[in-house]
Amino acid sequence: MIKAVLFDLDGTLTDTIQDISDAMNHALRLHDLPGWTVAEYCYLVGDGAKTLAKRAVRDRQDLALSVQKAYQAYYETHNLVTSKPYDGIPEMLDELQKRGYKLAVFSNKPDADTKNVVAHYFPQVKWDVVRGQVGGVPVKPDPMGALAVADVLGVAPDEVLYLGDTATDMNCARNAGMHPVGVLWGFRKEDELRDSGAEVIIAHPREIFTAQKL
């Protein structure tokens, strides 16, 4: 029986890609490097700031760490400019909360940024856990962080529904023994979600209630 719902943040709860793109392109400009389009960033993001920077600098890996630091410094103060919840997300969260499910966010975004975005856009939700990337915990798809969240929630992994928009999320859910649900309103396509093991794929937040019989 499902007792908790765990959400990825970027591309799942919130459309953050423009703010992420602007922040990384700002960092790249500071280093005289070319930027990327928003559409391209949809395939660069998802695996944490360190990996994003390595991908963004192309063959200038010697600048990756400096670009990462510049990106994070800028994004910390510019992560609420254009970002917004996806249509139907607030209503879905309200209904899940009414039905008594434990709710959590687990992101590869730095922990402080994760907490800031969630607190700003979802103040009405009584989250049980909100956690981003912290030192000593491998990024998704390693299951360590997801399992730690389940432990705090006091539920078994197979009692957790995990919603995400990328293969990283689906693989993390599978690695942790949770139930992966792919969402189509985020950054990636249906084929990627199916190929990475999504048990269910939904096109609108309200579908979660019928797809998983919550």
Identify the meaning behind each predicted range.
Residues A27, A70-V81, A104, V134-P138, ...:
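Hydrophobic, well-ordered secondary-structure segments
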Residues M1-K3, A39, P110-D111, K115-L214:
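Asp-based, Mg2+/Mn2+-dependent phosphohydrolase catalytic module
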Residues L6-D8, F106, L163:
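Generic enzyme active-site microenvironment
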Residues E95-K102, A156-P157, R174:
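Short, surface-exposed connector motifs at secondary-structure boundaries
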Residues I2-D94, R99-Y101, P110, Q124:
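N-terminal helical cap/lid subdomain that shapes the substrate entry/recognition surface
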